[in-house]
Amino acid sequence: VNVADPTADPDAVSLYLQGVTMTSSTGAPCILGQSAGKLKLTCSGINTLTDTAAAANADTSGVIYGDCDITVTKNSTGTLNITSSMNTAIRSKDDIKLNGGNISINTDVDATSDADAIRANNTLEIDGASVTVTSSADGLKSSKEDVSILSGKGIPLILSSPHFINFFAYLDQLVKIHY
C-alpha cells in the first residue's frame, strides 16, 4: 500500500492498492480512514481484503471503514475483492463513491453472518465501477440520503441478498437510476 503525496489534496488520503492481500483476524478494519477529509483508493491488479472476526466497536466496523468520504477512483483498473464474515464490507460515516474498477463483495460467508455489503450514512453512488454484491443483510444502504446508480456505459451491477426484495419494492424512493 502506497500513501500518495498529501500536498495534492491536503484533506485527502490516497492509497494505491497493487496486488494487495490483507486479512484482519481481530475485527479491526483492513483500511481505516480517520481524521481525513477523504479516503481515495485506486486499485490495480487483484486486491483481496478479508475479515474473520467481529469488530469490538460496531460503530467502526467495516473491512474498509472511514469517518470520511470513501472513493474508489475512476483510475482503478483492477479488482477489489472483499469478504467479510462479521462486519460491513465498505462503511462510511459520510459518502461512498465507486467510480472505477471491479468490486466484488461477499458478506454471506456462513449461517451466522449478518453484515451489510456497502453502507454510507450519506450518499452512496456507483458511477463507473463494476459491482458484484452477495450479502447476508443489506446490499446497498444509505442511512440519510440517496443511493445513485449511474449507468449507460455497459457496467453491470449484480446484487444478491434476502433484503433486495424490500430494496426493489421501494426503488422509486431509495434509488435514483440514471441512464
Task: Describe each model-derived feature in a short phrase.
Residues 1-163, 167-172, 179:
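A composition-driven surface/loop motif
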